[in-house]
Amino acid sequence: MKTDSMEAVHLDYENEEAVKQAQQIGASAWLALASGEANQLNATNALSHLTDLQVRDFALGVIGTATPNIQALISAFIDYSISDKNPDIDAPLHALRAYAYLCEGNTDKADLELKACFSLNSDYSLARLFERTLTAGWETDFYPKMAQELHPKVSDKIFG
C-alpha cells in the first residue's frame, strides 16, 4: 500500500490504555507481515503506527531477528510502501530500510536510505543514531545483535 493515501496514527500519550492498544495493533501487524500475511489491513496498521517509537523499534526487532527470506519480504514491502509524500510514515520506513541494509552489511545502500530519511525529516533520531554508528566505523554485525538484545524488551513493553 502506498503511503500517500494513508494517515499516520498520532497517539494521545496521556491515555495509556489507548496507547497500549494502538501499539499492539501496530506490532501485531509487523508480526503478521513477517509471517507472510501481507494484506491491506496488516500493511495499513504496520505503516500508520510507525509514528509510535515503540512500534518502530518493534519493527526493527522483527527485521533484525528475521530469517534472510523474511528480511527480503519485509524489505520488498518497505520498498513498495515508500512514497516520499508522507514524512510521518516515510521517514521511519527509510530508517527501517537503512537498518535492513546495515543488518546485511551493505553500508552504501544504508547511507542512501539515511539520506532519503533526512530529506524528509532532518532530525529523525533513529537515522541520526545509524549515521553516527556508520561514521564511527561500527561493525555491521552490531545491528542484528542489537535487535536480539532489545526486541524482547520492546515486545514485553508492548504486549506485557
Predicted features along the sequence, with ranges:
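Charged, compositionally biased boundary regions
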Residues: 1-160
